[in-house]
């Protein structure tokens, strides 16, 4: 557990153990998206075209189709609320041209933040396996969570939504798709600001939870 304003560690156990992070990987993905927005490289209203590769992602997804377009705003919503792998890859391609190029930026940002026990191989957390070189630690997840929630508090506009819908617009016509937040804390925890859950067969269950009460910002990571 970290205090968000100062970065002080309040409680820790095995904080530097390298583990597979599953979808809390997307905290870094969202951090780079928010940076790109603030730097004016992209706008919330920009269209994002979905590649065949992005549409092919398994795991948690919103079933985007090849050549479908959605706004940056909608893509952030899909990643933050539904942990959508297809939307994450589509945004990685939008910002960096390809997922590998985006992952390079993720690792550069991790180094900048002092994340000494982290290496990313993708922007989703899919197929995370320490043997493949995709890993992080509870403390490192806390560092990137602090970067996202403290420097880009606008993310809570998305991460605190319990349920929402998006509209698919494809050759087949329009259809509604429901989103439900994977972080159940947003339903009942007073002061919750986010942030991200993760779950795979290898990682089991992971959580980075952020909350603010009376000016105190707390970040709790469980892996």
Pin down the residues of each PLM region:
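Active-site-adjacent loops and short helices of periplasmic peptidoglycan-processing enzymes
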Residues: 1-142, 149-150
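Penicillin-recognizing serine hydrolase domain
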Residues: 98-223
């Amino acid at each position: 557990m970290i205090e968000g304003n100062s970065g002080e560690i309040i409680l820790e156990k095995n904080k530097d153990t390298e583990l597979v992070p599953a979808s809390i990987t997307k905290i870094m993905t969202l951090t780079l998206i928010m940076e790109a927005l603030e730097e004016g490289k992209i706008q919330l209203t920009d269209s994002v075209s979905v590649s065949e590769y992005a549409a092919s992602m398994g795991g948690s997804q919103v079933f985007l189709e090849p050549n479908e377009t959605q706004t940056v705003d909608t893509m952030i919503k899909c990643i933050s609320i539904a942990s959508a792998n297809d939307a994450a890859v589509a945004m990685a391609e939008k910002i960096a041209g390809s997922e590998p190029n985006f992952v390079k930026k993720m690792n550069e940002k991790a180094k900048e933040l002092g994340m000494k026990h982290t290496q990313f191989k993708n922007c989703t957390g899919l197929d995370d396996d320490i043997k493949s070189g995709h890993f992080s630690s509870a403390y490192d997840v806390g560092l990137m969570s602090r970067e996202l929630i403290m420097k880009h508090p606008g993310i809570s506009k998305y991460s605190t939504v319990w349920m929402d819908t998006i509209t698919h617009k494809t050759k087949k016509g329009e259809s509604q798709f429901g989103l439900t937040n994977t972080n159940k804390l947003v339903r009942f925890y007073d002061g919750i600001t986010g942030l991200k859950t993760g779950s795979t067969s290898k990682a089991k269950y992971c959580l980075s939870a952020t909350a603010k009460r009376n000016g105190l910002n707390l970040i709790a990571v469980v892996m």
